[in-house]
Amino acid sequence: MRLDDLDVALLTALHDRPRAGDLELSRVTGVARGTVTARLRRMEDAGVVTGHGPEVDVGAAGFGVQAFVTLEIAQGALDDVHRDLAAIPGVLEAHATTGSGDVLCRVAAGSHEELQQTLLAIDRSSCVRRSTSVIALSCLVPWRTLPLLHSSVAERARRPR
């Protein structure tokens, strides 16, 4: 789905005011409430907007030790390792990747000892052939999407029609 200026304006307003309703968003963006409702529904249906729940800072919630784990897995074992990783609470996300590893995981724990237990649980998967981990010392750029969305709209505006 290609996002236009209004879509990005709505996403920016939602980012700045996560609890805003359609009426407030219509005031902020200067468009009719029905337009806001229709645009948000369209973005939800397309999978652009995936939820309205709170963003949780795992560090502030007591899980300040975070690491990235690269896994090399058995040939054809992606579905099995997906199942195994999904069962481990400390695995925040896992991505199939290209390069030297097959899967990249982000994990969190409350202490180094808990991190070790999470890493051991990952290694217990029969699909994992090798794992390497690095501990994150700090987050330099937190998860974000708005700069990418704004640059996309700006790039399209610069193109000749």
Describe the residue ranges of each PLM region:
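A compositional/biophysical signature of low hydrophobicity enriched in polar/charged and small residues
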Residues: 1-161
